[in-house]
Structures are given as C-alpha cells and as structure tokens.
C-alpha cells in the first residue's frame, strides 16, 4: 500500500485543488455570471456528453488496463495499443453517421420543451469524442504507473480554463454563446495534451497487425462497455431526464447539489488511478492473499478519509446555501441522499477494479443493464411526482441496489468482503458527529460559521481517528507529513 498511498495522496491533493476551483465555478461564478437557463444548458451538455463518451470509447480504456500486463513482448503490446487507438475512432465515426441522419429527430425532440438546447446539440458529440480519447490516453499513462499528470488534466485543467472563460464573459470579452464553444475547445485541447504525454511515456510502433487474442479483447471491450458505463449512466441520467420533464434551469439547481456531494468521491477517484492497474496485476498473477488485503485496506482507508468530508458537507450545508442566490437553494434532503451514495461508493474500496479486471465482469454486465433500466424507471416515476427530489431519490435507490449487488458478487466469487468491526465503529461515530453539529449554528456570517464549525469537527474527528487507529495506512501518512 506504500506506493498506492503515496501516489493517491498526490492525486487527492491535485483532485481537491481541482474541486476547489470547480466549487468556485459551480457555486459562485456560474450562478452570478450566467443566467439560470444558460447554466442549465452547460450542465445538460456536459451530462449528455458523459452519457455518450463511454460508448465512443467502446470500453478500451478498461481493456488496456486489464490486458496490457498479460502481454510479455513489445510487439504484442504494440499491437494492443494500436487496436486501442483505432477501435474508438471507428465506433465514433459510426455514431457520428447515426447522429447526422437522426439530427432532425433530435431537433424535433427539443421543440416541445427547452429550445435553447437545439443550436448546441452537435457539441455533445465533440465533447464526448474528446473525453473518450482523453480517458484512453489517461489509461495509457496509468499502465505505466504515472497518474499524477493525467489526474491534473482530468481534475484541474478544464476547471481552471472554465474559470478564465467565465471571467471573460463577466467582463464582456466573450458572449455566452462563444463561451459554450470555447468550453468545448477546452476538452479538445485536454485530449491532445494527454495524448502527447502518453506518447512521451511510451510510443508504440504503428502497424495494422492485430493482437493474437483479438476475439477475447473485443469480447471484453464490448461487455465492459456496458458494465463500465453503468456508473456514468446512473450518475448523469437524472440530469438528462430533469431537462426533459422540468425547465432547464432545474438541471443547474440539481447540478449544484450533485457537485457538492461529489466532493466526497475525491479520495476514491485519487486512489483509483493507481489501484486499478495494481488490482489487474494481482488478478493476472492470481495473488489472492494480496488482493484480499488490498480490498479491506482500500475500503477502510477510503471510508476514514471520505467520512470527514461527508460530515463537513452535511453540517455546513445550510450555511453554504446562504452564500449563493436564493433561486439555487434546495432541500438538505437532496444533498444528504446524494452524499450517502458517494460515501457508500468509497466504502466499497477497489471493488470496481476487482470486478472489471476479473472473469466475472459478465455478471456485472447483467446487473448493470438491469439496474440502468431500473434507474430509468425510477426517474420516470419520481421526477414528475417529486421534481428534483425525485431525481435524488431515484439515484439513491439505484446506486444502493447496484453497490450491494457488487458486494454480493465479490463475496460469492472471491469469498471476501471489505468490512471490519472498525467500519461499524467509524459509521456510528460519523452519525453521532453529524447529528451533534448539524443543529448547532453560530450567530455570525456564514463564512465564519462554516470555518468555525469545520475546525471543531475536523479536530475532533482527527483526534478520535488517530487515537483509535481507524486506519493504519492513514495514521502512517499523517505521522509522516506531521514530522
């Protein structure tokens, strides 16, 4: 875990820096510099692109991580890398042709509701294509155990560029329409930068020769395409369906709550960059003992780190909403439901890496397809009835079923589970800390209240976590940097 913790810590710092910039954009710059309708438009375009890009990538970013270490010669590795580069291009061209022929249908789809979206529909394809290749080249760097630069580009670069663009809009240098086009170009430039970095780590010899186990690779890519897309679909489906049932500004309002809750997932995202290829390597070498140890320790470490973030969000949410325009404020219940989803995700440790790099990914595929349909039905029923609260409830139910399914699959097939008695103690402590501080408000400015409450909660949490040794890996990291 030493290398994992070291790179994960660097990635977590980078990711939180990016999320800090994103928080300023999401909570303040977008809400004050753009009209609600255009903020909702931006949120919709990015959510729709997130639904599309996994299909363009055709799962090859996961395929690369799984199969790369199984090849022993440079020639075979180069054949795999060439396939990884060409396959998404072919799929994207096919999807582009379908998009061209169905463009008039898409325009008619938006006639009945949010017509503001119509001129920008084609940008979804460009953003999705750029994101697909960015993820492929990011995986390229991860198989070389270099994830820090890619993580910076994934979490910081585009948010920093958006900050600059928003200020250009504020100072009337850019119109809102050109801002949206410029934002699209940011994603294209990010993909190009990631490609140059990946090639600097390892540039294959280009050939049209195909890897020897082509059928296995293609079958895995096709299946993992759906299985690996489930989390993305479950995450962004609600926002896309909100746009269909409610005025588009509701996408922005709901998106703020989603972004706040997503901060909890930062430790998991940071650790995943390095733990994913390592898990694949352990599975390829059949090292079950190390795999089991990694499963438990990653779960406990992620829970310890993400739990304090969960507490800070919930106890400060009312004060935080006082800092943004009234029209963007929503029920605390929505943030709580979405935050619980993210906390549960962290508790699973490296379960996704175990499943997607094992021979049991077909089972995940089956559950994923079923749960995507269930999530669609949940949103179909709950959004018209409860509005954005219904979207949050649908996401909570869908992710709860999905995560429990993954836990049961790993328990059944690998005879291991990530939880210990410490997991229960941490959850009880977190629940008590949250309830104790949620109703305690200081009579000061919201920023001062947030700072005071955050300091008190953090100090109490760190003292208890270190005293009772919630996670040995976290304790070692704290001692190292404390010195």
Task: Please describe what each predicted stretch is.
Residues 7-23, 182-194, 198, 211-281, ...:
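Transmembrane helical elements of multi-pass membrane transporters/channels
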Residues 3-62, 92-100, 127, 219-248, ...:
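Signature of the first transmembrane helix
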Residues 105-124, 313-343, 349:
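Interfacial segments at transmembrane-helix termini and the short loops linking adjacent helices
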Residues 438-483:
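Membrane-proximal transmembrane or re-entrant/amphipathic helices at the cytosolic face
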Residues 5, 130-156, 339-370, 410-412:
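Membrane-interface junctions at transmembrane-helix termini in multi-pass inner-membrane proteins
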Residues 57-72, 143, 257-299, 352-357:
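Helix-loop junctions and terminal segments of transmembrane helices
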Residues 1-4, 116, 176-182, 192-235, ...:
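Interhelical loop/hinge segments that connect adjacent transmembrane helices in multipass membrane
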Residues 153-200, 220, 370-374, 388-409, ...:
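Hydrophobic alpha-helical transmembrane segments
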């Amino acid at each position: 875990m030493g290398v994992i913790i070291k790179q994960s810590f660097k990635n977590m710092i980078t990711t939180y820096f990016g999320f800090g910039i994103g928080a300023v954009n999401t909570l303040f710059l977008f809400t004050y510099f753009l009209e609600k309708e255009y903020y909702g438009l931006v949120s919709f375009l990015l959510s729709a692109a997130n639904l599309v890009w996994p299909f363009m990538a055709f799962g090859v970013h996961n395929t690369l991580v799984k199969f790369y270490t199984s090849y022993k010669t440079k020639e075979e590795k180069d054949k795999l890398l060439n396939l990884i580069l060409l396959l998404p291009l072919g799929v994207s061209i096919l999807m582009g042709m379908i998009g061209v022929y169905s463009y008039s249908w898409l325009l008619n789809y938006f006639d009945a509701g949010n017509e503001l979206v119509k001129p920008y529909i084609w940008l979804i394809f460009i953003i999705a294509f750029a994101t697909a290749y960015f993820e492929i080249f990011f995986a390229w760097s991860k198989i070389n155990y270099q994830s820090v630069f890619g993580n910076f580009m994934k979490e910081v670069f585009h948010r920093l560029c958006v900050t600059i663009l928003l200020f250009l809009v504020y100072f009337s240098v850019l119109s809102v329409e050109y801002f949206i086009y410029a934002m699209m170009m940011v994603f294209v430039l990010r993909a190009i930068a990631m490609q140059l970095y990946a090639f600097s780590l390892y540039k294959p010899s280009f050939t049209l020769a195909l890897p020897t186990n082509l059928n296995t690779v293609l079958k895995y890519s096709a299946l993992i395409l759906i299985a690996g897309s489930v989390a993305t679909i479950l995450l962004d489906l609600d926002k896309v369906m909100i746009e269909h049932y409610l005025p588009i500004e509701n996408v922005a309002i709901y998106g703020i709550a989603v972004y706040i809750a997503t901060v909890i997932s930062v430790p998991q995202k940071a650790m995943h960059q390095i733990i994913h290829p390592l898990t694949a390597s352990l599975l390829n070498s059949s090292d079950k003992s190390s795999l089991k140890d990694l499963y438990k320790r990653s779960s406990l470490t992620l829970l310890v780190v993400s739990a304090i973030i969960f507490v800070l969000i919930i106890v400060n949410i009312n004060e935080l909403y006082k800092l943004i325009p009234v029209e963007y404020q929503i029920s605390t219940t929505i943030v709580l439901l979405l935050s619980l989803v993210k906390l549960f995700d962290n508790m699973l440790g490296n379960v996704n890496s175990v499943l997607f790099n094992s021979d049991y990914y077909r089972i995940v595929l089956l559950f994923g397809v079923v749960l995507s349909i269930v999530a669609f039905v949940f949103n179909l029923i709950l959004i018209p009835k409860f509005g954005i609260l219904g979207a949050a409830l649908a996401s909570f139910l869908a992710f709860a079923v999905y995560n429990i399914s993954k836990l049961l699959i790993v328990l059944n097939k690998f005879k291991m589970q990530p939880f210990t008695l410490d997991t229960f103690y941490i959850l009880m402590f977190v629940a008590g800390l949250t309830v104790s501080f949620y109703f305690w408000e200081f009579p000061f400015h919201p920023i001062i209240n947030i700072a005071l409450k955050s300091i008190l909660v953090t100090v109490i949490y760190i003292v208890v976590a270190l005293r009772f040794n919630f996670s040995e890996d976290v304790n070692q990291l704290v001692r190292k940097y404390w010195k």
